[in-house]
């Protein structure tokens, strides 16, 4: 897909988020649940509901590699808790989505509310700005499900 087409698709998503109260509420929920985990932070106790259920699975997690797009693959597991790994830019929310880039993070942001969860004052202060000045930062950003 050409950059111009990618920009138009993202702008359409942006308009929908601005006008749709349901999408705005989804963004608020995801941002409120979003967790920034710096390199040296102890993660035990961050999500107690997960820690107390850590032995509930009889089988180890499965990692599946396919030719499907990230959200397309995740949609194949309705009713399941699915994690989508965002190969994210450490310095720009959504990578180059606003300029029409077409890497994995840009594709995720183009067709969901993810960009609007990442592009917040809190994420700029705690994640993007520090990463611009760090040599080799290691942080994790968890964003709860967004449509």
Task: Enumerate the predicted regions with their spans.
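Conserved small/polar residues in nucleotide/adenosyl-binding loops
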Residues: 142-147
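Conserved N-terminal structural segment that caps and organizes enzyme catalytic cores in eukaryotes
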Residues: 1-141
